[in-house]
């Protein structure tokens, strides 16, 4: 049994660190949208955040393709961290052992970083979609409670669209985990890619309906 096979497939120890990293990365786009559209209506800010999230999701999909094509999908053979750590820095010893055991195998320091950056970006996109879902529900609720003449409107977008998108991105995260733990099983990899296309479509619908 090599070092990669001996590694547990799921190790939830670094979850809090990974979530924190995702939130930290998501703060950049959130602050940018807020500052750029300060003084504008909530609908305009939601539209801008939706378009930016769509752009970042497209970038994430491209980076996911790069992760697969560079053979980095198993750079960290467990999920959600890397050998139970929040980054490859904490897994230097385990990565070195796996690389020594399989010099041409899928685990190297470079591939581990590619895989973990993909996970960091995916977490940040997930957080942005969570913000969109919550913010849309809040704005729609305020509109329903406001006097009819003072309603500014969030166009014709239903709050269910961001909610469905949030559920879907959670499913995408689950497929991302299966992609790793099932050792890049072709059917799972294909479904994960198709899921990314559906996620892009959901965000496109929201972007054009604002």
Features from the language model and the residues they span:
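Membrane-interface loop-to-helix entry segments
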Residues: 13-20, 113-131, 188-201, 205
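N-terminal signal-anchor transmembrane alpha helix
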Residues: 49-71
């Amino acid at each position: 049994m090599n070092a990669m096979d001996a590694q547990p497939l799921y190790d939830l120890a670094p979850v809090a660190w990974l979530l924190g990293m995702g939130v930290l990365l998501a703060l950049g786009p959130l602050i940018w949208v807020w500052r750029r559209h300060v003084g504008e209506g909530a609908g305009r800010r939601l539209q801008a955040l939706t378009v930016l999230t769509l752009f970042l999701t497209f970038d994430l999909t491209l980076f996911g393709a790069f992760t697969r094509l560079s053979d980095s999908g198993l750079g960290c053979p467990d999920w959600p961290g890397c050998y139970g750590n929040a980054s490859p820095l904490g897994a230097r010893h385990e990565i070195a052992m796996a690389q020594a055991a399989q010099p041409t195998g899928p685990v190297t320091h470079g591939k581990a970083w590619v895989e973990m950056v993909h996970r960091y970006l995916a977490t940040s996109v997930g957080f942005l979609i969570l913000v969109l879902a919550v913010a849309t529900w809040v704005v729609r609720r305020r509109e329903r409670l406001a006097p009819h003449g003072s309603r500014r409107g969030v166009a014709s977008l239903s709050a269910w669209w961001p909610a469905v998108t949030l559920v879907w991105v959670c499913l995408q995260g689950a497929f991302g985990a299966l992609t790793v733990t099932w050792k890049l099983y072709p059917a799972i990899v294909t479904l994960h890619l198709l899921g990314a296309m559906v996620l892009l479509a959901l965000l496109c619908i929201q972007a054009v309906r604002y």
